[in-house]
């Protein structure tokens, strides 16, 4: 079996629809199905499943037409930089430990965060700087918590692939990355997903599909057995919210994932408008619903004259990269 630590650390982007995402977007915006242009998807992740549940049309634009997000948002950039810093810190600590060296210091943690933040395309603006200042207390709290207790970290950014047969001829894959897995004194493991922002209530963690998928991956893909606990680590509050997934619960998750995959593969990708799904949708200007939250980035794009009902709007959509 391949060592999961040796798998290249690359975020999956999903299947490419073809050489011209704009043409695909125009086809979908005009009421056509993306499945007219590409085979039914056989690759899924927690993010794709969550996006489809929020709005099937948004899923089609992002993951089938492969349209990029309009712009980097400070909240997402902050979270990405934090994840990169924590990953670098625990990896370096683990590697130093095998060499009998002292663990990295607080200055190293900040250096990794600054490097990740500088690598983003976020414009220099007051809102971005406000987010940047939030890093200091977060890094202080993470450093203090990680220094107070010995953690035996198995690995970081662990890639998994769950293979799910839908029928004798159809196999789909649910893949992703687990932020961190620690070994526990009991001989089992704890999986950890870092979160920035406000901590959730215990019942929200209990119903988390993301934690269920990751726990299933620990057992069925990574060969680590059922984790003793699955944890959301809210780093800005230094709070951990943990849940337990039984084997029976994980078996149910497998069945549920297969059902979700079938639903997506048979979908017409009709939009499901709501303030949550439309207010910050990068593709609202291409959607016929126009149920947009006032003042949202989507409204600004529509104000610039981009509308799915106008064929010229599609051609004026920003230049798109070639799909991976």
Give the positions of each predicted feature.
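Short cysteine/histidine-rich zinc-coordinating motifs and their immediately flanking basic loops
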Residues: 290-300
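Short cysteine clusters
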Residues: 55, 278-281, 287
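Mg2+/Mn2+-dependent nuclease catalytic core
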Residues: 158-255
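Hydrophobic (often cysteine-bearing) scaffold residues that line and stabilize catalytic clefts
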Residues: 74, 78, 82, 131, ...
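C-terminal, charged and often intrinsically disordered regions of DNA end-processing helicases
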Residues: 1-77, 297, 303-324
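A non-catalytic, helix-rich entry segment at domain boundaries
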Residues: 84-164, 323
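Polybasic (Lys/Arg-rich)
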Residues: 249-282
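Short, polar/flexible loop-turn hinges at active-site or ligand-entry regions and domain interfaces
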Residues: 67-75, 93-100, 124-125, 201, ...
